Amino acid sequence: MSIMRNFLSMIIMLCVCLNWCFAEGAEKSDSGKVLDSYTIQVSSLFPSSSSCVPSSKASNTKSSLRVVHMHGACSHLSSDARVDHDEIIRRDQARVESIYSKLSKNSANEVSEAKSTELPAKSGITLGSGNYIVTIGIGTPKHDLSLVFDTGSDLTWTQCEPCLGSCYSQKEPKFNPSSSSTYQNVSCSSPMCEDAESCSASNCVYSIVYGDKSFTQGFLAKEKFTLTNSDVLEDVYFGCGENNQGLFDGVAGLLGLGPGKLSLPAQTTTTYNNIFSYCLPSFTSNSTGHLTFGSAGISESVKFTPISSFPSAFNYGIDIIGISVGDKELAITPNSFSTEGAIIDSGTVFTRLPTKVYAELRSVFKEKMSSYKSTSGYGLFDTCYDFTGLDTVTYPTIAFSFAGSTVVELDGSGISLPIKISQVCLAFAGNDDLPAIFGNVQQTTLDVVYDVAGGRVGFAPNGC
């Protein structure tokens, strides 16, 4: 009898254990990941109407700024108007074309790209689709301004009063240097003026014409930048633009995070060791991300890949060595991405892949999604699905392998572009031009770390 009771007790314990294990498995399934696929709520693909929820990760370090998507629930620049996907795609393609144009010219000098101080007084096309913004205080007293941050640009600039040429419309009042006690124009004799090659009354004048015909022109200056109340930077070089054109959606200017000497990370090397990181929230979410300077708060789970010797002084290069869709590795050879490799860019929205690589990714994705109703393409995107009447959808995971044995699995929000419930598209595009570009949709929710001094870029999941 004693043996029987012990046996029954063991059976009961085993059942309890199995029940607990299955419950744990269900929890993991509910959280999104199931082996080689994600199951998500269809409603989560579309913008949330709930109020903004700030990310707690942005407040863990003093040198951290809140990042919002320009069209997201947390943006003070957004309106109730419907997101214009056609415009986003058009601007994104303009940015991509400007990147390839700069590469073909092999121009490493952003500031002197426009040699003349005579710029066309006409409406330029937007500076691409840089759609993530931060707010920084400039001057004394500080003037809070919303800036698009961009890893493909070096010089930080903002519109300034007076507008001697023309200025586009922005949400906040323009920065007025005469109202700041810490503003200083940079003299023509300054080493920082060497690249500008233009002067006005002994003051250094900068001119930047972007490849998409947007431009900014004004004085190269130094000013106090306030990141947070406890993190203030003195004598930061920036552009005080008095002649600016482009459709910048209400932002005051641009925060340059590129690899050049005038970028904010390069200027603050002694403070932050030329390290910065960010997490980009999906535009459909009601949460914020972060842009953090320095190594404080970087997760130990970050996996790094070397910054490649890509022949460009204005972008960060990375080497893609593999892509998987679900349980299938794409047949990528060492020559699939040519000698140019790839770049990672915070301002390009959608990832561009070599045409043959994209064709294989699309083929495998279609195979994994064969149980769903396909529909017509949209703009750049030729692989779309109709999810009408569905509560959930299961996507195959998509993972990128980078040099250094670094594997980055994309978040569910980094796979598709939801135009409407009857048209949800694979958010990748093929491109005959090189290099490949790893865009910001595919970077969403990842912690992306740029250790520029260490020559590496890192990734970790659940960054915001």
Curated annotation (Swiss-Prot):
Induction: Up-regulated locally and systematically during systemic acquired resistance (SAR) and locally by salicylic acid. The local induction is independent of EDS1 while the systemic induction is EDS1-dependent. GO terms for cellular component: apoplast. Keywords: Apoplast, Aspartyl protease, Disulfide bond, Hydrolase, Protease, Secreted, Signal. Its main location: secreted. Residues 1-25 form the signal peptide. The gene is AED1. Belongs to the peptidase A1 family. Gene3D superfamilies: Acid Proteases. It holds the Pfam family TAXi_C. Disulfide bonds join 384-425. Residues 132-460 form the Peptidase A1 domain. It comes from Arabidopsis thaliana (Mouse-ear cress). The active site is at residues 150, 345. Aspartyl protease involved in a homeostatic feedback mechanism regulating systemic immunity. Has only mild or no influence on local defenses. Acts downstream of salicylic acid to suppress systemic immunity. GO terms for biological process: proteolysis; systemic acquired resistance. One of its GO terms (molecular function) is aspartic-type endopeptidase activity. InterPro entries: Aspartic_peptidase_A1, PEPTIDASE_A1, Peptidase_aspartic_dom_sf, TAXi_C, TAXi_N. It is found in: Secreted, Extracellular space, Apoplast. It comes from the Eukaryota. Its EC number is 3.4.23.-. This is Aspartyl protease AED1.
